Each structure stands twice: as C-alpha cells, then as structure tokens.
C-alpha cells in the first residue's frame, strides 16, 4: 500500500498519518542513507548545513529535543524534567542519571554549563553561529551534578525552544577544558551512535552505542551516510542501495521514485522552514548603495517564479522574512506592500531601472556566488540571473562545492559580490529567522556585513515581547525596514518532499530537515 503524509497545519502541529498500524520496533540492521554534501568540519556549534547534521547528529544529545511525532512539541533529551519560573527569568533543568559519554566518562551538569558557555561566549578562535540565541542568558549555575539553572537578563519568547535546538550538541567539559576546539576535529558525545569513520568523499559510519541511556535504543546496529547527489543518488534510492535521503527531493524525482518503487515507497511532505536569500556584500561597491540592492530585489518576480519553479525544484511558497502560513508571518495583503513582492512586475522593474540609473549603475555586472547543490540552488540561481537580465544587468554564475561556498561567505573579509544563501531553521521562530538580518557584530550568520542599529533594536523589542499582537506589530516594522534596505532578501520558500523505502520505520517528517536526525527511534522492518 502506498502511504502519504501531509503536514499542512504547522502551527497546530498536525501529524495525522492515516492507514498505518502501530508496529513493534525490531532491533538490528544497518541503515544506509544518502547525503548530497559533506560536512566542512565536525563542530555542531559552528555549522548551519544539513550536510553536517545528517551524518553527525546521531553521535550527540541535546538538553531538550523535539518530539517529531507531535512536532513542535518538546520533550527531554539529556534533561529529565524542567521548570520555568513565573517571572520567566529562571530555567531549572533536572538531568538524567547514569548518562555516559562514548569514552566512558560520566555526564553531569558541568558538561551542560561548559557547552552553553561555549555557545553564548565562545573562546577566541571558536565560532558559535547561535551566540545571539543565548545573548539573554546572564549566568549558568550547577548546584549539583544533576541540576543546571539558567538565569536570564530579561524575558525571551523563544528560550525554551532554543534549548531544543538540534545544533546545540552537548560536549564534554573535560575535553573543552583541554582544547576549546576539540569538537572541530573529534567526535565524542553521549548520543545513540559512536563514531567509526569518515572517509572523505565517500561515507560516514556510526555504530550502536551499547551504553546509551535509553534502554533498548537505538534499534539499529549502525548507519552509513553515503555522500552522493543528483541522478546517482536518485538511482541509488530506486535500486534500494540506500533507503532514504533526509533533505528533500524535487517533484520530478519524487514521481520517478514512486513509479519505480511502487508499494515499496513512502512519501512524506510538508511546508519547510527554509528559504533561499540573496545576500549582497555591503562592504563592496556598488552593493554598499541601498538603491542597487533594492533594484535587484524589485526585479525578481517571486509570484511567477514560485509557480514555475515548484514544477522542477523543491521551492513553492512566496513569503517574507517568516514562513508563509506561520501565525507571526505577514499576510498576503501586507506582503504585497513590500518592495519586490508586488504582483505588478512591470512597475517594479521600471522602478528598479530608475534606481540603477540614479545610482549610476545602468550597466551593472557582477558575479553571483552559488552552491553546486542541484536542489534547489542551481535552478533558483538560474532563475534569478534571468530576472536580473530583464533589467539590463549582466551576471556571471559561480557555483562552488559546499566547503568553498560556505568559506566564501563566512570569512572575515568576504570578497563575493552577491551570493545565494540559505535561511533554514529547526522551527518557526522570529528569534531564529531574523538573526541573518542583525548587524554583523551581533550575528555570525550575517554575511551581508551591514550594521543597522534600527533593526537590532526592533529585534530586541520583539524578542522580549510575550504579547503576540504586540510582537506581530514590531515584526512588521522589522520586516518593512529589512526588505527596503535589502541587505539580504528572501526569494522563495521551500516545500519538503521525502521518498523513502517502507522498510525504514520510526522516522517522522517535520518542517525542518535539521530535526529528528539522531536516528534513535529508527528501525528496519525486514
């Protein structure tokens, strides 16, 4: 029987999957799955890509995690229970007893403190992409080995969900004391699988951790993440050489796999907390001129692009800074008022040409840096270049493999002109999605390099606002300024399509390709 899953009510966490009877998990077997890119290093705290989280996440635990069957509900991971004070300023966690690291050492509250100290105030030379998420933490206390207390400077609307971030791998305090950069080159966590090997350009292997704290888990004896992409990856899925690819497929690949696999295929799909954004290097002329950036955003027909691209790529939805359909996102009526979101593309492009002329850039040409990942970077990149051509702009398309692509944007003094960046998160939350638009000195994922204290102040206001209506109003102020200044600008939001073999059980799709990848609950029905 062919199975389908549609998670359309994200805010309500709709997770109904009809026609599937409950089954008892069976232990054993090795799961082989595909990953279409390779991690640049091994440090969770510095990474943002699926290429890292899919092979590496099974080695680690986090303080809390999402219950994928009830997403976006949260449950304990290393935390057994927790309490939030009435004033919202103190978070107390009781930790699991008897948890071991893979080297046999005992886990304690000191490891949580060391991990979050590294996240919120990284030592020199250590990169913490999510430092801004923990800027409101004033102190971390460890009254005993199984209790950790976070004290906040002010209320934060997203703090509890921050603690469920799949990126906040818990590291050994002892290892971090010896070398703060230990996680960049070494894998050593408390997760369901121990590290076996990473063969560059080939595969990543994990083995069942016999000392895992959850009795009976993981069910798998191990896993192999095979680095393969494009047509070879789809062929491997069709042939059963791999059972899954956890990021997402194009509609065409989905249709081909369903046709080939027949009743062996399971299809799961959902809107995606992920978008591609065009980032302009504001330290480089002419992209230091707001008129040029705004003109290039105005030239993009997002509405027509979404209709055309959804047939060939894993993008579908038109939205602003927040995922369309999310209750804090702009309405369609509000969107249409923003520059670049009008449905009158002829008027928008006329304005774009005038802005370029006023800036002395009527004959603008530049290099557009992109990632050589077919879905959806290449088709969206080609689409954007065609859009800019229609206002007389000449663009060279530079496509780089993941490591070089990330390095081109993340270096201290980037030399790129403009780049197709991604803004993906583990859940709908402005405190996460808006970090890319903060000033460069406040956000490690701002590659546009701008400083904008107006946006910084608006971010802080919405972050601490617990009244949803008031927060919504502040978010519209933020969005209006961000899209008018056009440091980075969103293009089209993604739609996640997963096809996997029905023999793989226990995996639930969520609106984030970062969530649910520890593989502790996955089992094989052979």
Stretch-by-stretch model annotation:
Residues 34-86, 117, 186-190:
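N-terminal lobe/hinge region of extracytoplasmic solute-binding protein
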Residues 210-256, 385, 394:
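Ligand-site clamp/hinge motif
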């Amino acid at each position: 029987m062919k199975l389908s899953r549609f998670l359309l009510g994200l805010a309500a966490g709709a997770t109904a999957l009809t026609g599937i009877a409950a089954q008892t998990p069976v232990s054993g077997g090795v799961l082989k799955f595909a990953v279409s890119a390779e991690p640049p290093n091994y440090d969770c705290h510095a990474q943002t890509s699926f290429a890292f989280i899919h092979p590496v996440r099974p080695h680690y635990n986090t303080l809390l995690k999402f219950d994928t069957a009830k997403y976006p509900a949260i449950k304990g991971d290393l935390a057994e229970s927790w309490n939030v004070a009435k004033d919202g300023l103190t978070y107390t966690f009781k930790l699991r007893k008897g948890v071991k690291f893979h080297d046999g050492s005992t886990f304690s509250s000191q490891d949580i403190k060391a991990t979050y100290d590294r996240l919120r105030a990284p030592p020199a030379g250590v990169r913490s992409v999510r430092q801004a998420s923990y800027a409101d933490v004033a102190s971390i206390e460890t009254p005993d080995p199984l209790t950790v207390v976070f004290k906040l400077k002010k209320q934060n609307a997203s703090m509890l969900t921050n603690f469920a971030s799949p990126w906040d791998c818990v590291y050994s305090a002892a290892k971090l004391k010896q070398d703060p950069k230990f996680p960049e080159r070494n894998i050593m966590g408390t997760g369901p699988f121990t590290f076996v090997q990473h063969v560059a350009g080939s595969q990543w292997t994990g083995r069942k951790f016999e000392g895992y704290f959850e009795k009976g888990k993981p069910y798998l004896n191990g896993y192999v993440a095979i680095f393969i992409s494009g047509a070879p990856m789809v062929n491997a899925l069709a042939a059963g050489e791999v059972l899954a690819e956890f990021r997402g497929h194009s509609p065409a690949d989905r249709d081909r796999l369903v046709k080939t696999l027949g009743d062996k295929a399971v299809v799961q799909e959902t809107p995606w907390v992920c978008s591609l954004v065009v980032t302009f290097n504001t330290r480089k002329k002419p992209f230091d001129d707001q008129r040029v950036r705004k003109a290039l955003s105005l030239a993009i027909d997002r509405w027509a692009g979404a209709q055309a691209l959804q047939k060939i790529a894993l993008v579908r939805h038109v939205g602003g800074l927040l995922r369309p359909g999310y209750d804090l996102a702009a309405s369609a009526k509000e969107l249409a008022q923003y520059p670049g979101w009008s449905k009158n593309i002829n008027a928008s492009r006329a304005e774009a040409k005038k802005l370029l002329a006023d800036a002395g850039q009527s004959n603008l040409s530049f290099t557009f840096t992109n990632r050589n990942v077919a879905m959806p970077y290449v088709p969206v990149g080609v689409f954007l270049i065609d859009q800019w051509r229609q206002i007389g702009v000449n663009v060279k398309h530079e496509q780089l493999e993941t490591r070089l692509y990330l390095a081109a944007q993340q270096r201290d003094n980037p030399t790129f002109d403009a780049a197709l960046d991604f803004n993906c998160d583990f859940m709908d939350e402005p405190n996460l999605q808006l970090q890319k638009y903060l000033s460069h000195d406040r956000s490690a994922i701002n590659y546009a390099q701008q400083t904008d204290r107006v946006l910084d102040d608006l971010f802080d206001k919405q972050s601490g606002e617990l009244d949803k209506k008031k927060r919504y109003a502040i978010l519209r102020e933020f969005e209006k300024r961000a899209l008018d200044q056009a440091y980075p600008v969103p293009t089209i939001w993604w739609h996640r399509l997963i096809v996997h073999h029905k023999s793989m059980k226990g995996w639930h799709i969520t609106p984030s390709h970062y969530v649910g990848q520890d593989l502790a609950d996955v089992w094989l029905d052979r």
